[in-house]
């Protein structure tokens, strides 16, 4: 069994509890190439765990993994593995993300190696993220050729090399029970024919993305039978104007997961992206995880988006630890090196594991009042066994002077004033409600 399976739109653990992933991204896009070389170590993992997070989306860069056609850089993979071991040693889940932006360095982006960047000599102006997707013909043609599976310089199709890279990563982590799975490509771009995707492009998803994900899943399954694939729509889905056909209906096990990002231009469109994410997951009975959002230092924006996620019971991973939370992991995580305001906004109460189905959770930043409700019926329709507990995370940053807790339908079975509260529902309780207020411990 993997660390997390799924039942409908929910992640579930081996005991059947609903699990809510919540955490951050760490992607080392450029030199010094790995999180380890950039200074990410035990102190960083401890900071995340101590503030209530349980998941990290960790970048794997194909250009570093396969710097030459067919050659896996095992030193790079060894370094990624050491970082995974640090994270899992702090009981953090890890999602391995094959990351790119703007295709690769040869087109002024990051991710893909130069040998896999086939632009057919089109103009390559130095446009900046994210406008380079629509302003740089070389980026568009590089994606066209990747989706067409053109042969690389050695005559081997590009996606075959890419699948070899995915297989090497999956083989390395096939038995790691804290790895959540593999995301084949961050924010894929449709290529030259991108305009239909502004309002949703099901035909292009079926033509380009579905075969790609099937090919990557086959590569993973050749060495790893337990970890799911995280399927992400084309990047224009992020703006909330169109739907996705992903991940699609399936009876396969493990079930593919829907990975989405929320980067719309208004609060209403952010809500639209979230609602479309939930609707797609519920339609296909697949788990959903918002694997990126944020990329800002404004606590008010972070809190507004976090409130919107809570309203929809959506799990999330903030972008990004190494851009918005910590400035330099080679230095002590104190003072100006730590963005306390961002960390304060992110470290919110939430249920990390629910012995039943969560039906509501919220946190009022002004009053520091948190409310949480859940049903004691599981996603599979069966009653949750009382032997298991529900876990409520109450970070010290949210309650620096402690907290008081009122509960209807359950009892606290953990130590008083703990930051991680364990609840056991009462014998006849069909629903549990929790209200947390500041002060009291």
Task: Place the predicted regions along the sequence by residue.
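Short polybasic amphipathic segments
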Residues: 8-13, 330-333, 405
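Structural detector of well-ordered beta-strand residues that form the stable sheet scaffold
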Residues: 95, 230, 257-259, 289, ...
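Aromatic- and acid-rich polysaccharide-binding/catalytic face
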Residues: 180, 186, 232-233, 244-269
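Surface beta-strand/loop "capping" patches
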Residues: 337-415
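C-terminal beta-strand-rich structural cap/linker in extracellular carbohydrate-active enzymes
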Residues: 348-357, 361, 417-441
């Amino acid at each position: 069994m993997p660390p997390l399976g799924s039942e409908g739109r929910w992640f579930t653990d081996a005991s059947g509890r609903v699990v809510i992933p919540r955490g951050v991204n760490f992607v080392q896009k450029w030199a010094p190439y790995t999180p380890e070389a950039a200074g990410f170590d035990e102190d960083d993992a401890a900071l995340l765990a101590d503030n209530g997070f349980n998941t990290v989306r960790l970048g794997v860069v194909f250009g570093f993994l396969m710097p030459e056609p067919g050659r896996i850089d095992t030193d790079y993979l060894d370094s990624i593995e050491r970082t995974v071991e640090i994270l899992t040693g702090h009981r953090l889940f890890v999602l391995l993300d094959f990351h790119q932006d703007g295709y690769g360095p040869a087109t002024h982006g990051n991710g893909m190696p130069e040998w896999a960047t086939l632009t057919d000599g089109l103009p390559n102006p130095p446009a900046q993220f994210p406008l380079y997707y629509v302003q740089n013909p070389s980026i568009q043609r590089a994606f066209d050729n990747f989706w067409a599976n053109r042969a690389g310089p050695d005559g081997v199709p590009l996606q075959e090399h890419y699948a070899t890279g995915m297989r090497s990563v999956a083989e390395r982590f096939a038995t790691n029970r804290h790895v959540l799975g593999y995301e084949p490509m961050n924010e894929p771009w449709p290529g030259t024919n991108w305009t239909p995707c502004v309002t949703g492009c099901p035909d292009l998803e079926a033509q380009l993305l579905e075969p790609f994900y099937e090919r990557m899943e086959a590569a993973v399954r050749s060495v790893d039978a337990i970890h799911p694939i995280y399927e992400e729509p084309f990047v224009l889905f992020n703006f909330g104007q169109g739907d996705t056909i992903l991940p699609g209906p399936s009876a396969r096990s493990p079930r593919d997961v829907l990975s989405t990002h929320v980067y719309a231009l208004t609060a209403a469109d952010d809500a639209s992206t979230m609602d479309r994410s939930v609707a797609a997951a519920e339609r296909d009975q697949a788990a959903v995880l918002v694997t990126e959002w944020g990329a800002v230092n404004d606590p008010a924006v972070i809190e507004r988006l976090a409130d919107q996620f809570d309203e929809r019971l959506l799990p999330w991973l903030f972008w990004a630890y190494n851009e918005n939370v910590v400035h330099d992991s080679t230095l002590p995580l104190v003072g100006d090196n730590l963005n306390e305001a961002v960390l304060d906004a992110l470290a919110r109460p939430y249920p990390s594991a629910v012995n039943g189905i969560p039906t509501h959770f919220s946190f009022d930043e002004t009053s520091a009042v948190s409310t949480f409700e859940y049903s004691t019926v599981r996603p599979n329709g069966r009653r949750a066994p009382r032997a298991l507990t529900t876990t409520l995370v109450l970070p010290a940053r949210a309650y620096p002077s402690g907290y008081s807790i009122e509960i209807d339908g359950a009892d606290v079975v953990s130590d008083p004033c703990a930051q991680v509260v364990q609840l056991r529902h009462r014998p006849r309780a069909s629903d549990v409600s929790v209200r947390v207020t500041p002060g009291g411990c």
